[in-house]
């Protein structure tokens, strides 16, 4: 009888003091693949000056939920000229570090602020210097470098799947076109280990 009371007391105390387990997310060493798309310099889908970008990143989590990222991006921005668009494309590689600014207790929503170094190539009108009306472009293709500051939000919809939203400002030097680009983007992240 004494053993029975002891077992009941043990079971009651375990039921009383056991906390709820949360998902194991953003642990050091975990990696994820991010695929993103963004509108560049505004939300203009029509017209001659709308821009967009696509990118993929590998992110690796460190202590406190912070993360390193390494990846690449393609950005296309059209510059208006009479009735046509002159494409300006940038192909960049990037590496950066993102600090966890905020997260909820259940580890579903995360907010990050990060900085990245960028390097790549910029091409104007795909290298063609003469326009349809005989005008010549003075802007030339060039290797570019610079950086970006990013504000990212991750919302986990499953343990290995997150939806992403980002606001980003890129600054690249050595190109002949616009130096700063603001990006508003969405994406998806797959945790791979």
Segments predicted by a language model, with ranges:
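Cleavable N-terminal export/targeting peptides
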Residues: 1-30, 193
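Short glycine/proline- and aromatic-enriched beta-strand/turn motifs that initiate or cap beta-hairpins
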Residues: 22-71, 77, 189-193
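Residues that define the transmembrane beta-barrel architecture of outer-membrane proteins
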Residues: 29-31, 48-54, 85-93, 109, ...
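Extracellular loop and loop/strand-boundary signature of outer-membrane beta-barrel proteins
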Residues: 41-44, 79-86, 133-139, 171-175
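Gram-negative (and chloroplast) outer-membrane scaffold detector with strong preference
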Residues: 57-132, 190-193
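Predominantly the C-terminal beta-signal and adjacent terminal strand-loop region
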Residues: 77, 152-193
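Extended low-complexity acidic/polar segments
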Residues: 126-167, 190
């Amino acid at each position: 009888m004494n053993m029975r009371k002891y077992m009941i007391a043990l079971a009651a105390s375990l039921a009383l003091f056991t906390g709820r387990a949360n998902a194991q997310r953003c642990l050091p060493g975990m990696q994820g693949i991010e695929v993103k798309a963004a509108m560049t310099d505004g939300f203009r889908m029509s017209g001659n000056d709308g821009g967009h970008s696509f990118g993929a990143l590998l992110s690796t989590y460190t202590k406190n939920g912070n993360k390193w990222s390494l990846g690449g991006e393609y950005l296309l921005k059209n510059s208006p000229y009479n009735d046509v668009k002159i494409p300006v494309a940038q192909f960049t590689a990037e590496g950066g570090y993102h600090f966890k600014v905020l997260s909820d207790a259940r580890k579903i929503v995360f907010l990050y602020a990060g900085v990245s170094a960028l390097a790549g190539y910029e091409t104007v009108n795909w290298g063609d210097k003469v326009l349809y009306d005989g005008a010549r472009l003075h802007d030339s293709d060039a290797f570019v470098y610079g950086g970006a500051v990013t504000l990212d939000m991750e919302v986990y919809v499953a343990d290995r799947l997150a939806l992403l939203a980002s606001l980003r400002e890129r600054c690249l030097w050595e190109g002949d076109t616009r130096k700063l680009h603001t990006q508003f983007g969405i994406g998806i992240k797959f945790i791979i280990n």
